[in-house]
């Protein structure tokens, strides 16, 4: 958390997506100015589907904080704990017997997140160094939430089947 807050890393995507957030916040237009040149542009479908920079601009406008600060400082402080919360929930679903497996699972997840920076393309690298980017939010939060929800649905289905079995075995 401290490293994400104090040592924000910058990469090539910042030249487009963070600048897009700044432009949307400062000019009030969405995807109408090319971030590289500052000139007007037609609507680019590929970049128009990237809505996270516009959400960052919205958060910046509502809070009065510069969009770059929101992206590089505020969002890691929100997304990193939120991701670990989802890991806790997944661990609770996988290891619901109350054993020591949940802390071991979370320790292994943390070790993989910290030491998984073996390439610029791993989700661990995106998680800790590019937290504010849509790719990182997808790989490290949205897909994990979907896994958590699927585990939740499976657990509910098992509970429903157990209730039906015990209900049908009761004497009339």
Q: Where do the PLM segments sit?
A:
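Glycine-rich, flexible loop segments associated with nucleotide phosphate handling
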Residues: 129-133, 167-172
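Membrane-interface transmembrane helices that cradle and orient dolichyl/undecaprenyl
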Residues: 143-170
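Active-site lumenal/periplasmic loops and adjacent helix-entry segments of GT-C-fold
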Residues: 2-133, 137-141
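Extended alpha-helical regions
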Residues: 115-122, 152, 156, 171-172
């Amino acid at each position: 958390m401290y490293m994400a807050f104090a040592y924000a890393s910058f990469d090539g995507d910042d030249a487009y997506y963070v600048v897009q957030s700044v432009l949307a916040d400062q000019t009030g237009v969405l995807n109408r100015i090319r971030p590289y040149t500052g000139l007007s542009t037609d609507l680019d479908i590929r970049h128009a589907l990237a809505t996270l920079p516009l959400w960052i601009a919205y958060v910046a406008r509502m809070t009065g904080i510069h969009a770059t600060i929101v992206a590089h400082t505020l969002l890691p402080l929100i997304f990193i704990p939120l991701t670990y919360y989802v890991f806790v929930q997944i661990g609770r679903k996988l290891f619901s017997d109350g054993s020591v497996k949940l802390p071991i699972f979370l320790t292994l997840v943390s070790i993989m997140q910290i030491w998984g920076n073996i390439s610029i393309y791993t989700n661990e690298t995106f998680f800790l160094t590019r937290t504010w980017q849509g790719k990182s939010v997808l790989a490290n939060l949205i897909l994990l939430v979907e896994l958590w929800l699927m585990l939740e649905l499976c657990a509910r289905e098992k509970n429903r089947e157990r209730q039906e079995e015990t209900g049908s075995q009761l004497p009339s």
